[in-house]
Amino acid sequence: AGDTSSEAKGMWFGPRL
């Protein structure tokens, strides 16, 4: 879900944030 962040953070912020 996210590159730098975890899957949970990827859904909230985005694939980069």
From Swiss-Prot:
GO molecular function, one term: neuropeptide hormone activity
Main location: secreted
One GO location term (cellular component): extracellular region
GO BP: any one term: neuropeptide signaling pathway
Keyword NAD: no
Residue list for modification Leucine amide: 17
Domain of life: Eukaryota
Keyword entries, A-Z: Amidation, Neuropeptide, Secreted
Stated role: Myoactive.
Protein name (record): Pyrokinin-5
Organism: Gyna cf. cafforum (strain SR-2005) (Cockroach)
